[in-house]
């Protein structure tokens, strides 16, 4: 709570992407984060569901998006390739841009970019590698 309030005060124009996994407990935690963002007047850009698939199920992101009255930006599948690329320090979107997971992540990023408020401060980060 205190950290979130401090961040909102330090970054009053920040925009929030709420990330959850399909499980109900994760949705509850992410819901509290989203409500904290709203209570501190931070704009919620949308919700991302992570680790979607056979192991954890799906639908938690959509339920949370509805609860927070925010768009569902996308559902990222539980993909071993995503972990493997993270372990070697090369983003999946760079190493395997044609993979389903990479395309979903790029789609989420493009949606976030398109939804930015006018006057948002954007700083490009170079890809290392």
Predicted features by range, described:
Residues 104-111, 120-129:
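A short, charged, Gly/Pro-tolerant segment at domain boundaries
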Residues 114-115:
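Generic C-terminus detector
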Residues 1-88:
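Conserved catalytic-core segment of NTP-binding enzymes
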Residues 88-103:
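C-terminal boundary of histidine-terminating zinc-finger modules
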Residues 71, 85, 99-100, 111:
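Residue-level detector of solvent-exposed, low-hydrophobicity positions
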Residues 1, 5, 99-102, 106:
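Alpha-helical membrane and juxtamembrane elements of multi-pass inner-membrane transport
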């Amino acid at each position: 709570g205190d950290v979130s309030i401090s961040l909102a005060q330090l970054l009053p124009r920040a925009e929030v992407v709420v990330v959850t996994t399909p499980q109900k407990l994760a949705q509850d935690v992410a819901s509290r984060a989203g409500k904290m963002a709203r209570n501190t007047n931070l704009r919620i850009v949308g919700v991302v569901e992570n680790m979607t698939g056979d192991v954890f199920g799906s639908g938690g992101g959509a339920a949370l998006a509805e609860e927070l009255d925010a768009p569902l930006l996308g559902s990222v599948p539980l993909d071993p390739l995503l972990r493997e690329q993270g372990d070697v320090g090369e983003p999946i979107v760079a190493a395997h841009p044609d993979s389903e997971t990479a395309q979903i992540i790029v789609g989420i990023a493009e949606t976030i970019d398109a939804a930015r408020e006018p006057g948002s401060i954007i700083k490009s980060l170079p890809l290392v590698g």
